[in-house]
Amino acid sequence: MAHCVTLVQLSVSCDHLIDKDIGSKSDPLCVLLQDVGGAWAELCRTERVRNCSSPAFSKTLQIEYYFETVQKLRFGIYDIDNKTPELGDDDFLGGAECSLGQIVSSQTLTLPLMLKPGKPAGRGTITVSAQELKDSRVVTMEVEARNLDKKDFLGKSDPFLEFFRQGDGKWHLAYRTEVVKNNLNPTWKRFSVSLQHFCGGDLNTPIQVRCSDYDSDGSHDLIGTFHTTLAQLQAVPAEFECIHPEKQQRKKSYKNSGTVCVKTCRVETEYSFLDYVMGGCQINFTVGVDFTGSNGDPSSPDSLHYLSPTGVNEYLTALWSVGSVVQDYDSDKLFPAFGFGAQVPPDWQVSHEFALNFNPSNPYCAGIQGIVDAYRQALPQVRLYGPTNFAPIINHVARFAAQAAQQRTASQYFVLLLLTDGAVTDVEATCKAVVEASKLPMSVIIVGVGGADFEVMEQLDADGGPLRTRSGEAAARDIVQFVPYRRFQNAPRETLAMTVLAEVPTQMVSYFKAQGWAPLKTLPAPAKGPAQAPQV
């Protein structure tokens, strides 16, 4: 299943609607439909605006947003003259199609209304703007304790804290710290938890804090507890006495079982993927295609580069699947595309980063179709050779990512798609390249084409722990996602993209967060005129 990134709210307005009513203006309503398995399904509607040819609808349209899929939308405008919910007996004033990705990456998108393909609805236009529905605030705290009671017979306590919020007459666990072993004066790691989860968004919601001694069998011993609110926690430095109720009742001389000290407590904004995209961050998409000899002679039907009578192969299918999603987030739709592992004319030297269009000074292709065309034209002009070296292309994209990072703004993020038929040859150099790239605003997606052994690729994916170079340097973050194409060859085409792109939003946000870069503080983008509107 696709992973829902967030909920998006769409605001809709129209201009210059055609009039279908005699003696008055139309009474328009907007219907939102989504392509579900090739059929249009209605999601929601706005209210009807009476007697208006340029309505601004007050009711917003809500839709779940998924980065890793192309969500095709259709907006239909109808003149409502009766009380029935069916639209078949209402006049159609025009419609427009686009993807949700186009809307969120444009912030505001204006499209011409069409009565049918090729027939405009007069001068009518529809303008759609997107807003993310969320409370992005998080509570970030640093907490320590002093002079906690000793609970273990043969050693000191192993303390941890639990924070509970009150709701519906119950206490709900909001956060649990790590355990600090054998320490009566522990300092816990700084932590962040969403404001909504911590206190329901209310700074005065009662909070209970429990300090306990960890036992491996689960029978944790209470050290002490106290009650507070987030408002009180923010009054740093704040100290709270841990009180053990039974000890307090038994001993008149009892004071406390230690104190908990809040060193820092801040409510901060935690930016989301859409915050960055709608703030103007461009996702730069680059493609690298494997032209090594192990693919087989392209003229042979057994070759992975063989173009079927329909003009496709596994390489192109994977490219279309991933590229069709990413292209919506790049405003100029110009994508650099490279090949590697081939002997290239005119001197027939092996190259591991040659431009597919054979123009090294301008390797950009116009849209995904442009990459496909360049690939088809390059295929008969090169000699498949080897070895399979990834490092040159990774380093190539990393140089551009490093230049972007020097701006110290969340303006650009780079996604490299590598399509390959076999295990990487330059393992050490590739590991080093990935580790260096992990410090930059970029992600690497590797799709394994064919039936080779891709064990080394799984190591690059590093799901079991951080990737390390031979010298022991660890990747700053996980930026590689690998999948074998044949796992998805019998699944719908969008399934591959859903799998390989699902981690990109998290990877992008984690990088910008680590750098401390907020989304670009740009003014809302001006509405695109109909002539500029992206074509779907």
Swiss-Prot record:
Annotated Ca(2+) 2 binding sites: 21, 79, 81, 91
Species in which this protein is naturally found: Rattus norvegicus
Domain VWFA per the UniProt entry, residue ranges: 282-484
Family from the record: Belongs to the copine family.
Ranges of residues in domain C2: 1-113, 122-244
Molecular function in Gene Ontology: calcium ion binding; calcium-dependent phospholipid binding; endopeptidase activity; identical protein binding; NF-kappaB binding; phosphatidylserine binding
Binding site residues for Ca(2+) 4: 152, 213, 215, 221
One BP annotation, GO: neuron projection extension
Swiss-Prot/TrEMBL cofactor(s): Ca(2+)
Record bears the keyword NAD: no
The name this protein goes by in its record: Copine-1
Pfam family for this entry, one: Copine
Tissue: Expressed in liver, brain, heart, intestine, kidney and lung (at protein level).
